[in-house]
C-alpha cells in the first residue's frame, strides 16, 4: 500500500440575484465548517488556549477531492458539505482564493499548498493540472527515502520557526510511515501585518481573570481608536461584546467575542456560535471611539486532524484497504496515513509606532466606552470583504 501523508502546516503571525445568494450560502457554509472544526478541537482541548486555521485545513482536503473516487469521495463531500466537482462551488472557491493573497505595504498574506511526490510515482495528468490551478498550489518532486525528508520539506516550506516551535516532522515521526510515503501535502496560511490603529508600546501589567477564576498580572496592550463594536445576545441569552480591530490595508481584521458577564465561561457560548449569528453580529457593528485593552498573547497548537475527520465520517481515506484515490494515480493502494495540523498566532504591538502619554490614558477616568479583554475571549482572524476565516481561537490564559 502507498502511504500519503497529509500535513497541515499553518502559521499565521499577527503583530459577500442567484449567484450572490449562492456565494452567501457558500460563505456561511465555510464559516459553519470552520466553527465545527473549532468545536471539535475545543472539546478535546479542555481548558487550554487554542488556535487553528480552517483555511489551511480544508484546502488539502479539496485537493484530495479531485482524486477521490467512490465512497472515499462521498465521505469527503459529506464531511465538508460541498464538493469541488460542482462547477459553481469550484468557481466560487477559485475566486476567493485568487483575491486573498496580498502584499500591501505593511501587510502580507500568503495562501499556498504544495504536493510533494516521491520521484517515479506516476500521477494522473488531469490531477496534476487541477493541483496547479488550485489555491496557489504546486507540485514538487521529492525523495522520501532520505532520513527526515518529510520533516525538512514541511519545515522548509512554512515560515521560519522561532525558538520553542516544535517541527512538524517530530509529530510525523511519532506517527510513523514517513519513509513509505509517496505523496505529502503541506498547506500554509501565513499572515503578518501591522495594526491600522497603533497600540501603545507602553504595555502595562494589568489583571486578567482566567477560566478557573485565577487572577494573573498580564501584559495588557492599549489603544484609543475608532473601532467597530456591538453588544449582542446569543440564542441562550448570554450577553457578549464584539469588537473588530482592522489591520493595515484592510487585508484582514481581528474579531473578538467577549462575554459581558465575568461568570459566563466560554464553554457556555461556544456551542451557540453559528455562521448566521456571526454574520448578523458583524453586519450590526457600529463605529465608536473606544479605549481598547487587549492582552498580548502567543499561541501555538498542533493536533491530529485524522481523529477529527474520522469522527466526521471520513473513514475510508485513512484505510489502506478501502481508500479510493485512483484519480491521483493509476496505482492502487494510495491512502492518507497522517494528517497533522499546526498553527500559531501572535498578537502584539510589533510593527506599530509608540504612542505618547499612554500611562496617563491608562489610568485616567473617561466617559469614552471601554472594551477590556481581561477575561477569556474568542477571536477570529478574517478577511472582511469575503468573511473568509483564516484562524479561530480562544485565549483562556495569555501567559500560557
Curated annotation (Swiss-Prot):
GO molecular function: serine-type endopeptidase inhibitor activity
Gene3D superfamilies: Alpha-1-antitrypsin, domain 1, Antithrombin, subunit I, domain 2
Residues annotated as site: Reactive bond: 365-366
UniProt-listed CDD domains: serpinE3
Keyword set, alphabetical order: Glycoprotein, Protease inhibitor, Secreted, Serine protease inhibitor, Signal
Endpoints of the signal sequence: 1-19
Location within or outside the cell: Secreted
Pfam family, one: Serpin
Main location group: secreted
Source organism superkingdom: Eukaryota
PANTHER family hit by this protein: SERINE PROTEASE INHIBITOR, SERPIN, SERPIN E3
Free-text function comment from the UniProt entry: Probable serine protease inhibitor.
Name of the protein described by the UniProt record: Serpin E3
Organism this protein belongs to: Bos taurus
Gene designation per UniProt: SERPINE3
Amino acid at each position: 500500500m502507498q502511504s500519503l501523508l497529509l500535513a497541515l502546516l499553518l502559521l499565521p503571525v499577527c503583530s459577500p440575484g442567484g449567484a450572490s445568494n449562492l456565494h452567501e450560502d457558500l460563505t456561511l457554509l465555510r464559516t459553519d465548517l470552520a466553527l465545527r472544526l473549532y468545536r471539535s478541537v475545543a472539546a478535546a482541548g479542555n481548558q487550554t488556549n487554542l488556535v487553528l486555521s480552517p483555511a489551511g485545513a480544508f484546502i488539502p482536503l479539496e485537493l484530495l477531492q479531485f482524486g477521490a473516487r467512490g465512497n472515499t469521495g462521498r465521505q469527503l463531500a459529506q464531511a465538508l458539505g460541498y464538493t469541488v466537482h460542482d462547477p459553481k462551488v469550484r468557481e466560487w472557491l477559485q475566486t476567493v482564493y485568487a483575491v486573498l493573497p496580498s502584499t500591501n505595504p505593511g501587510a502580507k498574506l500568503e495562501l499556498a499548498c504544495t504536493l510533494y511526490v516521491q520521484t517515479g510515482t506516476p500521477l494522473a495528468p488531469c490531477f496534476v493540472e487541477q493541483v496547479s490551478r488550485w489555491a496557489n498550489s504546486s507540485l514538487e518532486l521529492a525523495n522520501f527515502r532520505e532520513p527526515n525528508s518529510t520533516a525538512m520539506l514541511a519545515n522548509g516550506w512554512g515560515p521560519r520557526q522561532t525558538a520553542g516551535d516544535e517541527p512538524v516532522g517530530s509529530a510525523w515521526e511519532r506517527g510513523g510511515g514517513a519513509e513509505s510515503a509517496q505523496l505529502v501535502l503541506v498547506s500554509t496560511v501565513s499572515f503578518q501585518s501591522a495594526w491600522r490603529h497603533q497600540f501603545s508600546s507602553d504595555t502595562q501589567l494589568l489583571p486578567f481573570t482566567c477560566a478557573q477564576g485565577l487572577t494573573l498580572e498580564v501584559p495588557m496592550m492599549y489603544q484609543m481608536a475608532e473601532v467597530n463594536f456591538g453588544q449582542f445576545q446569543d440564542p441562550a441569552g448570554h450577553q457578549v461584546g464584539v469588537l473588530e480591530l482592522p489591520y493595515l490595508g484592510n487585508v484582514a481584521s481581528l474579531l473578538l467575542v467577549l462575554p459581558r458577564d465575568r461568570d459566563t465561561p466560554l464553554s457556555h457560548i461556544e456551542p451557540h456560535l453559528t455562521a448566521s449569528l456571526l454574520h448578523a453580529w458583524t453586519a450590526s457593528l457600529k463605529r465608536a471611539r473606544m479605549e481598547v485593552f487587549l492582552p498580548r498573547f502567543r499561541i501555538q497548537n498542533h493536533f491530529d486532524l485524522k481523529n477529527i475527520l474520522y469522527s466526521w465520517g471520513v473513514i475510508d481515506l485513512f484505510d489502506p484497504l478501502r481508500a479510493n484515490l485512483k484519480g491521483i494515480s493509476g496505482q492502487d493502494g494510495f491512502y492518507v496515513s497522517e494528517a497533522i495540523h499546526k498553527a500559531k498566532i501572535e498578537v502584539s504591538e510589533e510593527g506599530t509606532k509608540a504612542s505618547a502619554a499612554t500611562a496617563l490614558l491608562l489610568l485616567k477616568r473617561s466617559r469614552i466606552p471601554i472594551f477590556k479583554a481581561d477575561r477569556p475571549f474568542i477571536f477570529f482572524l478574517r478577511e472582511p470583504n469575503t468573511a473568509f476565516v483564516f484562524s479561530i481561537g480562544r485565549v483562556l490564559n495569555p501567559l500560557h
